[in-house]
Amino acid sequence: MKPLSSPLQQYWQTVVERLPEPLAEESLSAQAKSVLTFSDFVQDSVIAHPEWLTELQSQPPQADEWQHYAAWLQEALSNVSDEAGLMRELRLFRRRIMVRIAWAQTLALVTEESILQQLSHLAETLIVAARDWLYDACCREWGTPCNAQGEAQPLLILGMGKLGGGELNFSSDIDLIFAWPEHGCTQGGRRELDNAQFFTRMGQRLIKVLDQPTQDGFVYRVDMRLRPFGESGPLVLSFAALEDYYQEQGRDWERYAMVKARIMGDSEGVYANELRAMLRPFVFRRYIDFSVIQSLRNMKGMIAREVRRRGLTDNIKLGAGGIREIEFIVQVFQLIRGGREPSLQSRSLLPTLSAIAALHLLSENDAEQLRVAYLFLRRLENLLQSINDEQTQTLPSDELNRARLAWAMDFADWPQLTGALTVHMTNVRRVFNELIGDDESETQEESLSEQWRELWQDALQEDDTTPVLAHLSEDDRKQVLTLIADFRKELDKRTIGPRGRQVLDHLMPHLLSDVCAREDAAVTLSRITALLVGIVTRTTYLELLSEFPAALKHLISLCAASPMIASQLARYPLLLDELLDPNTLYQPTATDAYRDELRQYLLRVPEDDEEQQLEALRQFKQAQLLRIAAADIAGTLPVMKVSDHLTWLAEAMIDAVVQQAWVQMVVRYGKPNHLNEREGRGFAVVGYGKLGGWELGYSSDLDLIFLHDCPMDAMTDGEREIDGRQFYLRLAQRIMHLFSTRTSSGILYEVDARLRPSGAAGMLVTSAEAFADYQKNEAWTWEHQALVRARVVYGDPQLTAHFDAVRREIMTLPREGKTLQTEVREMREKMRAHLGNKHRDRFDIKADEGGITDIEFITQYLVLRYAHEKPKLTRWSDNVRILELLAQNDIMEEQEAMALTRAYTTLRDELHHLALQELPGHVSEDCFTAERELVRASWQKWLVEE
């Protein structure tokens, strides 16, 4: 323990003079001298109750002793027979335990987190004990309050603020809300009372017991102003009245307050769970909610003005960088995202701050600085208050109390303490300003050119716009004005509340100043106004763009680059959330991490809620698609990587859909009993075409077939027993249903299962043996071609190995070259007649001669032709690596393979970019002439001349 500083050693002599006989100096430990010198509250208390000091020295405070508070208090109240006795015992108990907490805190015997826990638990113990004693007394006097079924009704108490969060400070008010479950009246009393009357009277008595000063002091100052309607509202409300109020009239600051609400006492009872479930939707919105930022900013502005008005300087709670700003930072994330991130729904600040860091909503460095600052400030606040058990957050101006705080905070002197304090508060202020801003940051709004506001609000004529639109052509200027006018007319048809109008009037001048600075202003504005029309009645999305200038800039650049992205954002505004973090927006998920990220994403949704699961799958896909497209546009992803990401994403989706379908089927029917003898599920999904070949585009459908290895005699082992093969058929049907069901977020993927044996006429799911037999004995050459680009995208190792063996066996069959050449060429000519040359003077990149399909047919032909001699050709299912294999195995010259690869990737890159522009896959006839000529020559060489 650090020795007392010089000023405190001098003060100790004053303390000694006050001590009574039983507390002679020589009987005191060094610890006792330190605490008595530091805290006048402890000093006064032990002078009045010397036995407390004896107890402290023989049984020092422990970190976990809060667990005994209830038992200790129960013993203290065991002989209480009237309200006066109750009040006296509660006050003495509170003072005795507060002395123990002050002792532990001054000497740093336990952590600051433990101090906060002890202070909060003490308050809860006292509140609950007082409530329970009074409830019994009131029931004896007036009867027991019951509902219509005759069930006893309890009084539930919501602890708000720091009490609710388990973070009560040393000398604090307690904010409470009283509630009771159902209407009814008392039973068993001398006269019948309505439940509302019973609980109102009981509530009044409870406040008096806790709050009224007596010769023993008070227990806690009780503040009931956070209840619905404040001081003018009923003291106690029924659950129904509470629900009505918060649904119809609950304000933003009440949501802010309710984040920390905690039910005192038995928080796991039926009524407690009912109350908690009722309040949760009000506090945590299911959708991301950015309206809270302005509300919190307004509240912070009010507090800042109050600080200035009351001349509050050196206030570690309300001042810049103080405790309140840390609380605001944490609650911004809770209120914005808490509905979708259960880890943010904690009432306590430090666990929530850890969750914020874990979700990467704040950098690790910022989160750690806030954590350290919070613990520093809370310790300083509690020490300050424990000097005199006084509710203050203002640093002292007198030398004695400054010396006390410097010593207790482990600093040599006051300047060192204030220096460290300044560092912490500066760190907090920086994070706060970056996130929430404040009145002082509104100068940007004031400095925004008045002309942009006029352009938005005053519907300027073209002549008036010259200064801001001078760089645009006359046609573009006219178009911009028309777009603004049309957008305003569209707004007049919509129901937009005053808040929505206010946000739009703030957003649009900023948006116009950014958009109209671009050369392509008219095109970009047309895409963005189309998006805005879809979200104007949903103020929370407007607020996102208004509050986060970086998000607005990303929106503008992405919409300018791609109408596909603009359409996606307009259709699914939930995706706007992705614009907030450029680190993730332009950095798609690592290719091997999609499955894990999706699994984590789905953990937020109840497994048994199919509708939410389907919605979550679609939302995840769209968010990932946006990130891939953003990286594509930014040039950070080459074409091959774009397809890799789209393919990995699809595989993650298949994995999740099969998992969902499997769980649903097993719940209904049990598992096929042959699985008892083997690992895995006996089921595989095979991807063909673009999926099999790692070549998916932005809007590609999935070519899938389903395989199982279920014996004929297998049955399921559930209560509803069905044939094992029937189980797998229903599983496949369920998978198709989950992919194609249209929710508010659209469908997941179009799935085409017609490549299965016998096509649309065949069974949806095929046994592995039947598949092998079909491929050997019935399949056409084009089906063997399709097999070149096929691979298992979901399945257990046994079935995967079986499919790979069948594929290898079929592809390595000896084939007569001329016959194969003719069959492949004729199939291609049929396709070209059916799909190609539909656009006169245009080149269809995929279907026309010299396009992508020709390259695919060349590689498929060469694999089928030569795999018998060179089995290594069967290794890969994508065209680029097949071309590499053809060169490595001396079938195609390396120069030709590389040239075809370049042509192939160039054409695919163009298809990706046309998709981003929402344009069809054809271009002018004079495009890609060199690539097409190269492909034609290769086609001639391999499929015509040989």
Curated annotation (Swiss-Prot):
<keyword id="KW-0808">Transferase</keyword>
<dbReference type="GO" id="GO:0047388">
    <property type="term" value="F:[glutamine synthetase]-adenylyl-L-tyrosine phosphorylase activity"/>
</dbReference>
<keyword id="KW-0548">Nucleotidyltransferase</keyword>
<keyword id="KW-0067">ATP-binding</keyword>
<dbReference type="InterPro" id="IPR043519">
    <property type="entry name" value="NT_sf"/>
</dbReference>
<dbReference type="GO" id="GO:0000287">
    <property type="term" value="F:magnesium ion binding"/>
</dbReference>
<dbReference type="InterPro" id="IPR023057">
    <property type="entry name" value="GlnE"/>
</dbReference>
<dbReference type="Pfam" id="PF03710">
    <property type="entry name" value="GlnE"/>
</dbReference>
<keyword id="KW-0547">Nucleotide-binding</keyword>
<comment type="similarity">
    <text>Belongs to the GlnE family.</text>
</comment>
<keyword id="KW-0511">Multifunctional enzyme</keyword>
<dbReference type="GO" id="GO:0005524">
    <property type="term" value="F:ATP binding"/>
</dbReference>
<protein>
    <recommendedName>
        <fullName>Bifunctional glutamine synthetase adenylyltransferase/adenylyl-removing enzyme</fullName>
        <ecNumber>2.7.7.89</ecNumber>
        <ecNumber>2.7.7.42</ecNumber>
    </recommendedName>
</protein>
<feature type="region of interest" description="Adenylyl transferase">
    <location>
        <begin position="449"/>
        <end position="946"/>
    </location>
</feature>
<dbReference type="InterPro" id="IPR013546">
    <property type="entry name" value="PII_UdlTrfase/GS_AdlTrfase"/>
</dbReference>
<dbReference type="GO" id="GO:0008882">
    <property type="term" value="F:[glutamate-ammonia-ligase] adenylyltransferase activity"/>
</dbReference>
<keyword id="KW-0460">Magnesium</keyword>
<dbReference type="GO" id="GO:0000820">
    <property type="term" value="P:regulation of glutamine family amino acid metabolic process"/>
</dbReference>
<dbReference type="Pfam" id="PF08335">
    <property type="entry name" value="GlnD_UR_UTase"/>
</dbReference>
<dbReference type="InterPro" id="IPR005190">
    <property type="entry name" value="GlnE_rpt_dom"/>
</dbReference>
<feature type="region of interest" description="Adenylyl removase">
    <location>
        <begin position="1"/>
        <end position="440"/>
    </location>
</feature>
<dbReference type="GO" id="GO:0005829">
    <property type="term" value="C:cytosol"/>
</dbReference>
<comment type="function">
    <text>Involved in the regulation of glutamine synthetase GlnA, a key enzyme in the process to assimilate ammonia. When cellular nitrogen levels are high, the C-terminal adenylyl transferase (AT) inactivates GlnA by covalent transfer of an adenylyl group from ATP to specific tyrosine residue of GlnA, thus reducing its activity. Conversely, when nitrogen levels are low, the N-terminal adenylyl removase (AR) activates GlnA by removing the adenylyl group by phosphorolysis, increasing its activity.</text>
</comment>
